[in-house]
C-alpha cells in the first residue's frame, strides 16, 4: 500500500475506449483485460474515490465505416450506443465478480437490462461508494463517447476526466509515426487547440474547457498508472486552465 493515504481526487470520471477492452484481440472483449481493469478500479474504490465510468463501443461496432457505405448515420450511432451498453454489462459483471458494487445506467431506456440514467440517482449511488457506469453515450446521435464522458463528468461534478489510452499521454506528434515526439506533462486548453494536439474531438474538448473540467490522459496498459494518477503522482498529461 502507498504511504500516502490521501488520494488527490475525491470523484473522477474514467473514460475507457472500447478498443482497450479487446486487448490483443482484434475484436470483442478480452476477459483477462476486463478483469485487470476491474481490479484497478477496485483499488480506487478501496481508497475512497468515487468512480464514474464511460466506456466506448469501438471494439464491438464502428458506425463510421458503415456510414460511408451508405448506412444512415443516426442508425449507425444507435447501434454504437448499444455496443457501449454491452461493454457496460461486461464491466459491471467483472466488477461484481471482484466484489465491487456497481450500477449500470443507460442514456436510452432498456428496461430489464439496466437502469435509465437519472442524475440525482447517479449522485446518490456515487456517494454510497458504488461505481456508476454510464452507457449509451449522451443518448443522441452525432455525439462521441468522449463527449458523453465530459458531459457526465460535468453533471456529477467530477474533479477530473481520466482518459485512458494506449499511449503515455499527449505527445507533440504521433509517437508511433515520429520517434522524436515528446511527451507533454502539462498543457493548457488553449495550447491543445493552438497546436492541434489530438486529445479528443473538439465538441468534447470545448465542453470540458468551458466548464473548467481538467482532463488527464494516461496509459491504462501501464500497470499501476491509474493508481499513480489518483494519488497525484506525475503520470500522463494534465490539461487544465493554466494561470499566467
Swiss-Prot record:
UniProt keyword terms in alphabetical order: Allosteric enzyme, ATP-binding, Cytoplasm, Kinase, Nucleotide-binding, Pyrimidine biosynthesis, Transferase
Binding site for UMP: 57, 77, 138-145
Top-level EC class: transferase
Family the entry assigns: Belongs to the UMP kinase family.
SUPFAM superfamilies documented for this protein: Carbamate kinase-like (SSF53633)
Binding sites annotated in the UniProt record for ATP: 15-18, 58, 62, 165, 171, 174
Species in which this protein is naturally found: Aeromonas hydrophila subsp. hydrophila (strain ATCC 7966 / DSM 30187 / BCRC 13018 / CCUG 14551 / JCM 1027 / KCTC 2358 / NCIMB 9240 / NCTC 8049)
Protein name: Uridylate kinase
Location in or out of the cell: Cytoplasm
A GO BP entry: UDP biosynthetic process
UniProt-listed Pfam families: AA_kinase (PF00696)
Keyword ATP-binding: yes
Pathway stated in the Swiss-Prot or TrEMBL entry: Pyrimidine metabolism; CTP biosynthesis via de novo pathway; UDP from UMP (UMPK route): step 1/1
Gene Ontology cellular-component terms listed: cytosol
Biological role: Catalyzes the reversible phosphorylation of UMP to UDP.
UniProt cross-references to PANTHER family, sorted A to Z: URIDYLATE KINASE, URIDYLATE KINASE PUMPKIN, CHLOROPLASTIC
Matching NCBIfam families: pyrH_bact
Catalytic reaction equation(s): UMP + ATP = UDP + ADP
Amino acid at each position: 500500500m502507498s504511504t500516502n493515504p490521501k488520494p488527490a481526487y475525491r470523484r473522477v470520471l474514467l473514460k475507457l475506449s472500447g478498443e482497450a477492452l479487446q486487448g490483443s484481440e482484434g475484436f470483442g472483449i478480452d476477459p483477462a483485460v476486463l478483469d485487470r481493469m476491474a481490479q484497478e478500479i477496485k483499488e480506487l474504490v478501496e481508497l475512497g474515490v468515487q468512480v464514474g465510468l464511460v466506456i466506448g463501443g469501438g471494439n464491438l461496432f464502428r458506425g463510421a465505416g458503415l456510414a460511408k457505405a451508405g448506412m444512415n448515420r443516426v442508425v449507425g450511432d444507435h447501434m454504437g450506443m448499444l455496443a457501449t451498453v454491452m461493454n457496460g454489462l461486461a464491466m459491471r459483471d467483472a466488477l461484481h465478480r471482484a466484489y465491487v458494487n456497481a450500477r449500470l445506467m443507460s442514456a436510452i431506456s432498456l428496461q430489464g437490462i439496466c437502469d435509465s440514467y437519472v442524475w440525482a440517482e447517479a449522485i446518490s449511488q456515487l456517494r454510497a461508494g458504488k461505481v456508476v457506469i454510464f452507457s449509451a453515450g449522451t443518448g443522441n446521435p452525432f455525439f462521441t463517447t468522449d463527449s458523453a464522458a465530459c458531459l457526465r463528468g460535468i453533471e456529477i461534478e467530477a474533479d477530473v476526466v481520466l482518459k485512458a489510452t494506449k499511449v503515455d499521454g499527449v505527445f507533440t506528434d504521433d509517437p508511433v509515426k515520429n520517434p522524436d515526439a515528446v511527451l507533454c506533462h502539462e498543457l493548457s486548453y488553449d495550447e491543445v487547440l493552438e497546436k492541434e494536439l489530438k486529445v479528443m474531438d473538439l465538441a468534447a474538448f470545448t465542453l470540458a474547457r468551458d466548464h473548467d473540467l481538467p482532463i488527464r490522459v494516461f496509459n491504462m496498459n501501464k500497470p499501476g498508472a491509474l493508481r499513480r494518477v489518483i494519488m497525484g503522482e506525475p503520470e500522463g498529461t494534465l490539461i487544465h486552465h493554466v494561470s499566467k
